[in-house]
């Protein structure tokens, strides 16, 4: 009887302890639930730390600011091949935001966190990049929170109308198909399109992608190669773009690229105005507008646009070379030479490098 009572008391005590433990756990979890104001502050802190670390040439903060657990779960939902071939290498390569932004800075480009917003309870940060070759991108970062800190959980990539998780899933799957003897017909066609693009055979690539569009849109790289073909081969740019039925941000991004390339400054400004509704304002838009004006041979107007850009951002390489192009086309030799010499203190160029640049223009 005594043993029975002791056993009962022990069980009661255990249950009580479990109850206390659960209660403490609940209190701890409640304690770590962030308010909207705290989440907003965490996002602001994330942006400030990211900017400072990249300016200091340090990639670690942003490389570690990805919620790899959440991103991997999103990738695996899409039936990827992360555990096969180079799957995990592809995954980690796409997560290296710090390396990515540091490389852009080192190339003479720039980046900017343009705007933040909250939609359906999810925090977003729009990142703009502009590399040393004049390529610009917008990425809508989807932010989650862990231990009070903001982390990147996924991102919408304007240029390919896909989430980062879709891109990783598609790339890892296609990578496996490239290593086996009998890939699916769709994978073979996508591999062929990749090879045609690498060889500069845009016409053949464009024909293949249009013929197989319904089957190949499962691969995010389809949008990359399709838009290359669109810019190189299409006789109805707007119509072919709309036919994809893609996200409006993708459409506006590529319409702007097309307007810049063809020197349609009026259309460029129209698309910029529409994109600002999604990205927030950014002085890089003045650089892009200046490029459209330059291609339209409106050099004085382009110089004015570059000057406006400089008031809101660093004097990046493309602004400098853009101004040099305008002065050269205007045959303003004196101002051209003065601007050229500025390359010594702006970018640390030697006399020989300055002389080479002068000859190239």
What are these regions (language model features)?
Residues 22-56, 180-189:
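Short, low-complexity N-terminal intrinsically disordered segments enriched in polar/charged residues
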Residues 41-43, 120-122, 135, 181-190, ...:
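Generic helix N-cap/helix-start motif at coil->alpha-helix transitions
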Residues 83-133, 242-249, 276:
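Surface-exposed, charged secondary-structure patches
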Residues 105-176, 354-361:
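Exposed beta-sheet edge and beta->alpha loop/turn motif
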Residues 147-207, 299:
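Low-complexity, intrinsically disordered terminal/linker segments enriched in charged
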Residues 194, 226-229, 257, 291, ...:
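Residue-level recognition of tetratricopeptide repeat
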Residues 199, 231-233, 262, 296, ...:
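Structural motif corresponding to the intra-repeat A-B loop/turn of tetratricopeptide repeats
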């Amino acid at each position: 009887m005594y043993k029975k009572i002791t056993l009962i008391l022990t069980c009661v005590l255990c249950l009580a302890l479990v109850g206390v433990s659960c209660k403490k756990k609940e209190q701890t979890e409640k304690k770590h639930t962030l308010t909207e104001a705290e989440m907003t502050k965490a996002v602001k802190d994330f942006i400030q730390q990211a900017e400072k670390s990249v300016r200091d040439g340090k990639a670690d903060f942003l490389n570690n600011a990805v919620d790899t657990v959440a991103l991997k779960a999103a990738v695996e939902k899409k039936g990827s091949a992360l555990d096969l071939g180079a799957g995990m290498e592809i995954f980690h390569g796409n997560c290296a935001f710090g390396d990515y932004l540091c490389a852009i800075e080192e190339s003479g480009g720039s980046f900017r966190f343009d705007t933040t917003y909250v939609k359906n309870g999810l925090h977003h940060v729009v990142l703009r990049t502009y590399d040393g070759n004049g390529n610009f991108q917008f990425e809508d970062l989807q932010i989650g929170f862990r231990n009070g800190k903001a982390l990147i959980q996924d991102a919408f990539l304007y240029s390919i109308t896909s989430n980062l998780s879709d891109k990783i899933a598609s790339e890892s799957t296609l990578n496996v198909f490239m290593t086996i003897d009998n890939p699916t017909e769709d994978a073979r066609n996508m591999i062929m399109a990749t090879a045609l693009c690498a060889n500069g055979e845009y016409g053949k690539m464009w024909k293949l992608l249009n013929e197989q569009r319904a089957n190949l849109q499962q691969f995010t790289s389809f949008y990359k190669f399709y838009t290359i073909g669109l810019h190189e081969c299409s006789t109805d740019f707007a119509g072919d773009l709309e036919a994809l039925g893609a996200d409006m941000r993708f459409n506006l991004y590529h319409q702007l690229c097309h307007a810049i390339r063809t020197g349609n400054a009026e259309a460029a400004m129209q698309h910029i105005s529409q994109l600002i509704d999604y990205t927030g304002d950014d002085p890089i838009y003045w650089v892009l507008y200046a490029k459209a004006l330059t291609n339209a041979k409106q050099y004085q107007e382009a110089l004015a646009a570059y000057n406006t850009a400089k008031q809101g951002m660093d004097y990046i390489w493309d602004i400098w070379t853009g101004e040099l192009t305008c002065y050269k086309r205007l045959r303003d030799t004196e101002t051209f030479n003065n601007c050229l010499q500025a390359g010594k203190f702006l970018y640390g160029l030697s006399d020989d490098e300055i002389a080479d640049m002068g000859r190239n223009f």
